[in-house]
């Protein structure tokens, strides 16, 4: 959208008004594919009856079903894969605008800009002198990843695109928050996952590029940054950086005006002591960690090509909670993976009871063509999968309610997000223990001495009531 906006296209969220319809798709699991296809068909019908002259399909679905989309849906005029971002302009019939000077060049003369191209660039950078560069090239430990040999023959077909700080962005998030992608692709060969086929080999953005983009966003008024990637904890390893994510967090946390900084999707065996120390020492790094574990049974995890098990995970969680007291932990699991026996499920159930996650998601196994698990036998019946999913969510509901009850009486800083969708009598907000969009909500029913609140501002509030996933709060002071 940023490229289209910079080129002069007028963007609208109302499909009936558009001359060019763009459907950005996902194809990670069956439900995402179905939603994408349904939306494409809906836009195809709109194209034939409305003012739209072109229909473009973009994103992951194109990487998996490019030819099928073209053949099956003749209303589609163009397809744009995940590695073909620039092609959106030609597909939409929009002339590209001249690229402005790199925002990083503007920042390069300031003390807050960090340039790390090699060892020689570290001269005079006292704060970051501990950064250790390895030899050129990808020297990461195997850690269950695809080897160079396994990528041979496929690399030329995989996406390689990686945006940088000069790529124009059109923010669709609330004005106070933004996501920043620090890496693309994944090298982990998880047998249930097709992301490596859709997104390509793991590749990190340049350190200084991420810093520059966050500086730009904060200068525009963004106060909360969420770092994302398919595997954020491996950030920088392909660039030769050791503890790259910890170093990046250290640098970003020093940016004046950044109130909250968090990252999502930590691979469990990449959570280092240095990373935890960094989270603990900065007040503006949210005490929040999202670690998708996928299962707890060693047998299931082995078939998933992930390894470890409940005992190892419990030790990891203990290490995290000791290093960062009060941290909120989120995870996700897959039920119904091929071969998941009743005893495997029992191991998972008992692990969840003992681990006591603050937030938890349970996904039904999706049998994806092209994944390693697609070829496995001993498929679990859908009825059994649904039953197991409901059982785990009921268990987590009770765990979550007990955890939220511990919040009652505490005063926490929250970000006000606006009137509740349920009723204008309530406002919604989040604490540092809530990631955007995926966790519960804080409902504000008492503004204290204030007549009104302002979306995008921070307030101190007392938690007065707890439910399974949500809490009720009254404002004590602010805006902060």
PLM region descriptions:
Residues 1-235, 274, 289, 311-322, ...:
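Proteins enriched for Cys/Gly/acidic motifs involved in redox and nucleic-acid/cofactor modification
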Residues 55-57, 64, 219-345, 353-354:
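Conserved SAM/AdoMet-binding glycine-rich loop
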Residues 77, 223, 259, 358, ...:
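Short acidic/polar active-site loop segments enriched in Thr and Asp
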Residues 163, 173-176, 186-188, 219, ...:
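Short flexible coil/turn linkers enriched for glycine and charged/polar residues
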Residues 190, 210, 227, 263, ...:
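Conserved, mostly hydrophobic/aromatic
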Residues 195-196, 228-230, 264-266, 292-294, ...:
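Generic beta-strand/beta-sheet core signal
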Residues 236-257, 303-307, 367-398:
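Radical SAM enzyme [4Fe-4S]-AdoMet core and its adjacent flexible, acidic
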Residues 375-480:
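Terminal RNA-binding accessory module
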């Amino acid at each position: 959208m940023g490229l289209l906006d910079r080129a002069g296209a007028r963007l609208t969220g109302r499909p009936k008004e558009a001359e060019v319809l763009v459907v950005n798709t996902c194809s990670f699991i069956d439900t995402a594919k179905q939603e994408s296809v349904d939306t494409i068909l809906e836009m195809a019908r709109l194209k034939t009856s409305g003012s739209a002259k072109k229909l473009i399909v973009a994103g992951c679905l194109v990487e998996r079903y490019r030819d099928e989309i073209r053949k099956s849906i003749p209303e589609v005029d163009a397809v744009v894969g995940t590695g073909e971002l620039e092609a959106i302009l030609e597909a939409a019939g929009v002339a590209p605008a001249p690229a402005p000077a790199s925002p990083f060049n503007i920042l390069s003369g300031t003390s807050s800009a960090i340039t790390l191209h090699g060892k020689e660039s570290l001269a005079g950078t006292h704060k970051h002198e501990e950064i250790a560069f390895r030899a050129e090239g990808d020297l990461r430990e195997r850690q269950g990843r695809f080897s160079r040999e396994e990528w041979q023959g496929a690399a030329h077909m995989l996406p390689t695109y990686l945006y940088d700080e000069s790529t124009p962005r059109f923010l669709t998030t609330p004005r106070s928050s933004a996501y920043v992608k620090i890496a693309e692709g994944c090298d982990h060969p998880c047998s249930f996952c097709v992301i490596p086929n859709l997104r390509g080999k793991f590749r990190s953005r340049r350190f200084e590029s991420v810093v520059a983009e966050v500086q730009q966003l904060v200068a525009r008024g963004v106060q909360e940054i969420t770092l994302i990637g398919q595997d954020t904890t491996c950030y920088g390893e392909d660039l030769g950086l050791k503890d790259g994510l910890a170093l990046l967090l250290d640098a970003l946390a020093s940016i004046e005006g950044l109130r909250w900084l968090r990252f999502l999707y930590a691979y469990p065996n990449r959570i280092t002591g240095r990373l935890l120390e960094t989270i603990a020492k900065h007040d503006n790094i949210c005490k929040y960690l999202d670690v998708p574990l996928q299962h707890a049974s060693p047998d299931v995890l082995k078939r998933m090509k992930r390894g470890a098990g409940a005992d190892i995970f419990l030790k990891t969680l203990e290490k995290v909670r000791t290093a960062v007291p009060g941290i909120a932990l989120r995870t996700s699991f897959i039920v119904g993976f091929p071969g998941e026996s009743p005893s495997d499920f029992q191991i998972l159930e008992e692990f969840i009871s003992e681990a006591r996650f603050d937030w938890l998601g349970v996904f039904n196994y999706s049998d994806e063509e092209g994944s390693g698990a697609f070829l496995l036998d001993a498929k679990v019946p859908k009825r059994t999968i649904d039953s197991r999913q409901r059982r785990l969510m009921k268990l987590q509901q009770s765990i979550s309610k007990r955890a939220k009850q511990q919040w009652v009486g505490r005063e926490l800083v929250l970000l006000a997000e606006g009137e509740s969708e349920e009723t204008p009598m309530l406002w919604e907000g989040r604490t540092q223990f809530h990631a955007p969009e995926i966790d519960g909500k804080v409902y504000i029913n008492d503004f204290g001495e204030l007549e009104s609140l302002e979306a995008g501002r921070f307030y101190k509030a007392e938690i007065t009531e707890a439910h399974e996933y949500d809490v009720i709060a009254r404002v004590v002071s602010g805006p902060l």
